């Protein structure tokens, strides 16, 4: 059950803000073995691991066009409409992030500029596990398509009958995924990192997963392929004062807790009354949840923290740097201006985390484990590279050249200096 903490001292903060431990190092030997086998044996190894881990015997990894077409008829019109609405909002928000480059003359005759280009080949990992995360398909494939990624590869584990959830296939087709493969876990990450007979090698891998997937992404990113960001268990913090609705707050905490047993939900509040009411409401709502066993286990990692004022609440919040932050206070826009460490922020009593998880338009692939102090969530920028260009004309070289020569000489790099000198000699 959630722990009630009242007026902790600053000396206690570090202990209070600890996340559930995610020890991937102990898994590295196992994960490395799987990666090496897939790298050496390709499809054969992936198929063997699918049989061992996902308990399914597959004849091929590739999802056929017939399977994709059939999926549309297997989900309700209501769900198709919801997915289409979410896709439209995600597309609208991420399209607004398009880079507009401009040429800058840093001095007369010296011009610099940038060009944004999509990463040519990207791999998206969509977990199977306890729920079909078709929303993550939209969060990753939509910005990849806007960025101009030429090849968008998706891997997701099949069920025991060898089928992919139809909502995942529908979302993938709607968002413009190029190829879909029946592969999960470490073997899927390895297949995208190194390529197999079926699965193309990609340049960057995106998507959440369990501790094995996290370890695999860490290992392949050491030298072979880029990844989106360091990942850990999902988390939410609600920052609230006496004006907050305890029913809403409890619902938000539980919506995070049902993600998985290692998720974390935190309330930081200035109201002792709210703290007590939220505890009571969490217990009431928990009893009605289908995934209550998972949520209850997660709540053991979770805390309801009472602090003396909003200044302290914000200081503690910025120290925690939550993946998701819900601000339910009287003057939430003013409070939000003082938030400097968070992945995504949800403002006011009518903005639950679920909105960003699914359909408001922001991305739900976010930094966890305190990485919001240094990392951003996935955005259009995650799928592009910015190439810099520069052009120097004669009048520019005459002015900038001597400065370059002087700097190169003082760094004892004579060839650097000479590359300028030979050009200046032609301009005399």
Swiss-Prot record:
Residue sites binding NAD(+) per the record: 125, 187, 210
Residue sites binding substrate per the record: 234, 256, 259, 324, 357, 411, 416
Keywords: Amino-acid biosynthesis, Histidine biosynthesis, Metal-binding, NAD, Oxidoreductase, Zinc
Pathway(s): Amino-acid biosynthesis; L-histidine biosynthesis; L-histidine from 5-phospho-alpha-D-ribose 1-diphosphate: step 9/9
Active site: 323-324
Co-factor binding comment: Binds 1 zinc ion per subunit.
EC assignment: 1.1.1.23
GO molecular function, one term: NAD binding
GO biological process, one term: L-histidine biosynthetic process
Catalysed reaction equations from the record: L-histidinol + 2 NAD(+) + H2O = L-histidine + 2 NADH + 3 H(+)
SUPFAM superfamilies in alphabetical order: ALDH-like
Binding site for Zn(2+): 256, 259, 357, 416
One cellular-component annotation, GO: cytoplasm
Pfam family, one: Histidinol_dh
Gene3D superfamilies, per database record: 1.20.5.1300, Nitrogenase molybdenum iron protein domain (3.40.50.1980)
Cofactor dependence: Zn(2+)
Similarity annotation: Belongs to the histidinol dehydrogenase family.
Its biological purpose: Catalyzes the sequential NAD-dependent oxidations of L-histidinol to L-histidinaldehyde and then to L-histidine.
Listed name of the protein: Histidinol dehydrogenase
Source species: Bacteroides thetaiotaomicron (strain ATCC 29148 / DSM 2079 / JCM 5827 / CCUG 10774 / NCTC 10582 / VPI-5482 / E50)
Gene designation: hisD
């Amino acid at each position: 059950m959630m722990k009630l903490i009242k007026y902790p001292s600053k000396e206690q903060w570090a202990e209070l803000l600890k996340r559930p431990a995610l020890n991937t190092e102990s898994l590295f030997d196992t994960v490395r073995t799987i990666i090496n086998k897939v790298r050496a044996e390709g499809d054969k190894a992936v198929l063997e691991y699918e049989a061992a881990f996902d308990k399914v015997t597959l004849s091929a990894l590739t999802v056929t066009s017939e399977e994709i077409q059939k999926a549309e008829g297997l989900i309700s019109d209501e769900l198709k409409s919801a997915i289409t609405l979410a896709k439209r909002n995600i597309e609208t928000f991420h399209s607004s992030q398009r880079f507009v480059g401009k040429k800058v003359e840093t001095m007369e005759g010296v011009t610099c500029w940038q060009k944004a280009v999509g990463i040519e080949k990207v791999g998206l990992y969509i977990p199977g596990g306890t729920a079909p995360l078709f929303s993550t398909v939209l969060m990753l494939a939509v910005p990849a398509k806007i960025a101009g990624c030429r090849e968008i590869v998706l891997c997701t584990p099949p069920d025991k009958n060898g089928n992919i959830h139809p909502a995942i296939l529908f979302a993938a087709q709607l968002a413009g995924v190029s190829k879909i493969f029946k592969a999960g876990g470490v073997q899927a990450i390895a297949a995208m990192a190194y390529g197999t007979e079926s699965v193309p090698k990609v340049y960057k891998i995106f998507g959440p997963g369990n501790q094995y997937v996290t370890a695999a992404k860490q290992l392949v990113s050491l030298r072979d392929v880029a990844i989106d960001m360091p990942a850990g268990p999902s988390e939410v913090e609600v920052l609230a004062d006496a004006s907050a609705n305890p029913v809403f707050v409890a619902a938000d905490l539980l919506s995070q807790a049902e993600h998985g047993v290692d998720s974390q939900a935190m309330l930081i509040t200035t109201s002792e009354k709210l703290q007590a009411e939220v505890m009571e409401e969490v217990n009431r709502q928990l009893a009605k949840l289908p995934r209550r066993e998972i949520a209850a286990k997660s709540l053991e990692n979770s805390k309801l923290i009472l602090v003396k004022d909003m200044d302290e609440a914000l200081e503690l919040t910025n120290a925690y740097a939550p993946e998701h932050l819900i601000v339910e206070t009287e003057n939430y826009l003013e409070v939000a201006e003082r938030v400097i460490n968070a992945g995504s922020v949800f403002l006011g009593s009518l903005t639950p985390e679920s909105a960003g998880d699914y359909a408001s338009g922001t991305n739900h692939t976010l930094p966890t484990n305190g990485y919001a102090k240094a990392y951003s969530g996935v955005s259009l920028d995650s799928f592009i590279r910015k190439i810099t260009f520069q052009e120097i004309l004669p009048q520019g070289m005459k002015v900038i050249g001597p400065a370059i020569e002087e700097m190169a000489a003082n760094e004892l790099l004579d060839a650097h200096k000479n590359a300028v000198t030979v050009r200046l000699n032609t301009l005399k």
